[in-house]
Amino acid sequence: MFRRYRVSVIIHRSVTRGCYRGWSEGKIDVTTTYDKNHWENVNVWTFDVVCLTRLGVQCRQFDPVSGPFSMNNERKNEGSVYSVGSQNHLVPIRSRKTFFKKKSQISNLLLIILFVLVGALSITVMILAVLYGCKNMMKICDSEDCVRIAASLKESMNESVNPCDDFYQYACGRWPQEHPIPDSSLTNSWFSERSNRMYRKIRDLLMVNISASEVPWAVMQAKTLFTSCMDVYTVNELNLSPMFDLLKLLNLPMIPLVTKKTTNYIEQLASVKKILDLDIFFGFEVIPDPKNKSKNILYLHLPIRSNPFLTDKELEKRLQTIRSRLRKLDELDDEVMLSENEDAELIYMVDVIKYIINNGSDNKCSSDNESIFEDEVLKDFVKEIYNISNLFYDMTRADQNQSISVESLSDSDYMLVDDLQKLTDDYVIDSNLSLTPTPIWRPFIEFIFEGIDKLDLDNKDKVLIGNLEYLKDVALLLACFEEEALGIYVWWTVVDIVVPHASEKLRDIWNKYVSKVTDVEVVGESKSLFCGSIVNKLMGMAVSWMFVDPTFHENKVNKVQEMLEDIREAFGSLVAKTDWMDQLTKTATLKKSHKMEYEIGFPTWLFNEEKLNEYYEGIDLSETRYLANMVQIVQVQLIKTWTSLHDENIFNESYWATDPTDVNAFHTFQLNHITIPAGILQFPFYELGLEALNYGAIGTVLGHELTHGFDTSGRLYDGDGNLRQWWTNKTILEYSDRTQCFIDHYNTYYEVDDYIDGELTLGENIADNGGLREAIVAYKRWKARHGHEPLLPGFTQFTHEQLLFLSFAHLWCESYTATSLKWMMEDSHCPGHVRLQAVLRNSKEFSTAWNCPAGSTMNPSKKCRLW
């Protein structure tokens, strides 16, 4: 005989304001089984909890035996049954009286246990209601921004990967499938995709017909530059005439060894710098004095290899890297690569020079040019240019780590040009008595400032020497070569930067060469995109007038400012908790952080027509003179630099480190200044629907830039932007010990055929690690003020902290080839997948948020940390 007891308990659940209010009925069915002769096994207590909910709330299951509360299981229609079993052996009953007495005692005991369990379960349910009821009823964000980022995150992820094994593959494993590498590139990333999108929009804006009455004069000048670039017919008709006009302006021959020599190579060097801002054998600038940024000073240093006209920054950087690597291949003993790339460059040089000698036609040269046109003579001519280039590349590389720093900068680094000349002359003579030193520094500087500003090189106007040993080596090499050979090298350097902007024939020669050495197909590049990029590079502020929404500051700036202030305060709290900085250094560091200024979006004067026009004052562009237009813009901007030598520097909102269209962010050490252009304040960096996602994306970028102020270079500048020692020696030593951890950590990452250079990338790695930590702390500050956010559609099982890390990872998703990885190894930034993995492995907060076991791939025992 069996008897069944049923106890029904009604549980009232009340949830605090902000969640739903309702009733939930729980039924607890307890069945006890026995026969009338003796107890068998009392082995089942069954709890059937049925949640009757309102508003479509999903029930969450709690196992009273094992305890965990499941937030990830799907809702089931059937009841959830949990059992507690007992296998106790009971003694048979000997008498009816004893039987009923025993039965009564057991029943009472069971009732007591039942009520205890019911009470415990009731309390548990109520606690869970309080703890998780709000989350269950949290609003799901259904805005366009939330849906967009949720879809992008989802399509990028490979959820079959364990996030604690490889978070990059987990977050970005499918990104390359959805974002293939364009034919014109070796890589793809969010940064390059957004930049290309920006260029297309700029191109479209420039192609719209507008009248002078509708826009500022500066914008019409930008339209004129675009029109001249697009006018292929006129460019081809003019052929080499614009190039020859430029060579004449620079005091360079149209054709070396044929044109009669009229000037020395020092004047040619100075002309090229004065008009095109092109460094050849050494670098020269007017800069704020590192010890006192309120005044400017002349600065001699290693050459900065850049092209004033080239549009694609990544292509320019890669080409310089390739040429530098090519000249290192002798050391690497890679004869095949050396031969292939050297041949490609030599063929390019020969083809260009032949075309120029032939005056841009297929006709045979005149008898005057016959000797140089012969192949053997031309090859020797080209080889000499190539050899000079090799020597200066080698020399630059050998001395690149010897530039001035706070530890070495002294009053002796400021000297008069004649004193510098004596030092370099003595070095040349000591090296080889048969050599005659060449006067370099005074004639070079005086020629640049001729007709611009009056100098006092005898007393007042000293020169800051960035690398004395390099300048000595320059003087020695210049003394070793014939003036004619040096003049030819200067001539070729100018021709090389003009080729992509000359006739279609020369541009085809250029494209063929670039495609060969970079493995990038550039032949089919859109002419309109090319021209739009040119205009953006040379007249970025005028282009920004068309691109930027005037209401941008009203809609976005306040939120970005709030985020920046959160990050600044987060950095301050992290510094305050450090145990390796002494109090004096902490105070100075916090002071610098609070003095750090930032500009967001675009300059406040951008939509002031008078100031915008003043920014480009001095140019007068023509729709039929494309090359001359570019030269004119560069020259006008340079004149402003040269004339600023004796001006007092007043840095205010007019200063901008870049154009508003740039998809990047910048830190200027000497100004203690961060620039956040409008170009980067777009998907997937910003406006992601939830602040957890925004802090994980643009927040980490802002933290990165702030931390640059305290990396291995930034820490040398105080809060006013002056170069001096403002940390104590003890703190500097502690800092060096901790940064060594980062060097060692990044040195372990192997890519293609080499390891990451932890020293080369140290500054960026410090900024990456600090930026993430600051964004995490900053988001906590934001949440403390604003409360919990809605859930992300498709990601309701994720905490907001997890979403922050997903957003951070999403930022660094990329597509790349083995060849492109080789070029990345030369950069001060690690490849995106290394940046992500290395930073997260150093993050305790990441391991906690994702429950990564100690010792797992993403949670190693040793972590590097500064703040």
Residue ranges and their predicted role:
Residues D145-C146, N162-D165, Y170-N236:
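Active-site-surrounding "flap" and adjacent substrate/cofactor-binding loops of secreted or lumenal enzymes
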Residues K201-D566, D620-Y626, I633:
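Noncatalytic, helix-rich "gating/capping" subdomain that lines the substrate-entry/channel surface
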Residues I112-K139:
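Alpha-helical transmembrane segments in eukaryotic/viral proteins
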Residues Y20, F47, L52-L55:
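Intrinsic disorder
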Residues A129-E155:
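Short, Gly/Pro- and small/polar-rich lid/capping loops
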Residues G85-A120:
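Helix-loop boundary elements of multi-pass alpha-helical membrane proteins
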Residues S366, D375, I385, V406, ...:
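Intrinsically disordered, low-complexity linker/terminal regions across diverse proteins
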